[in-house]
Amino acid sequence: MFIKGVILSSYGVNGYARVKSISNNFCDFINLKDNKVLLKKNNGFTIEVKVVDVNIKSNSLYLKFEGINTPESVKSLIGFELWVDDSLASSLKEGEYYLGKLIGYAIVNDNRRLGEVVSFFEYLNSVFLEVKVGIKFFFIPFLSIYIGDIDAREKTIELKVLDLLR
């Protein structure tokens, strides 16, 4: 499963939800029509819903879910993350990664395990990996100046700059 977006607000009177795309690629959302998705809240609450319509207007994305027909119903879903099956995830180009899939990867340098990716977050136009080293946590910018090879088979991420873990 992959996170594809977050519900931001209701839109109109018919129960549409305005959604922020995690990938900023709206085209892939068209494939969600007539498919079930999971809406997850960070408190662990999960709802399975069917997407019945996808609408893109003025650089904004709107989804309509089966059985959710009023703005009030959508308001209770604000902040929920939209999770989709792997088969509905956006396609990736060479060198692109689903950040959620990097959770659990080992951070290595010279084949020495230093820590583990436990989370990630986006701030402005930057992505940071949260890495646990022993009992400490560090944030590593997800940039090629700091991050080297990512090995999906070995589930490792090379750290080029060790000073980021001090």
Swiss-Prot record:
Predominant subcellular localization, coarse grouping: cytoplasm
Keywords (A to Z) from UniProt: Chaperone, Cytoplasm, Ribosome biogenesis, rRNA processing
GO CC terms in record: cytoplasm; ribosome
Pfam families assigned: PRC, RimM
Domain PRC barrel intervals: 94-165
Compartments, record wording: Cytoplasm
SUPFAM superfamilies: PRC-barrel domain, Translation proteins
A GO biological-process term: ribosomal small subunit biogenesis
GO molecular function annotations of the record: ribosome binding
Domain of life of the native organism: Bacteria
Described function: An accessory protein needed during the final step in the assembly of 30S ribosomal subunit, possibly for assembly of the head region. Essential for efficient processing of 16S rRNA. May be needed both before and after RbfA during the maturation of 16S rRNA. It has affinity for free ribosomal 30S subunits but not for 70S ribosomes.
Subunit note: Binds ribosomal protein uS19.
Domain remark text: The PRC barrel domain binds ribosomal protein uS19.
Protein family per UniProt: Belongs to the RimM family.
Protein name as it appears in the record: Ribosome maturation factor RimM
Organism: Borrelia garinii subsp. bavariensis (strain ATCC BAA-2496 / DSM 23469 / PBi)
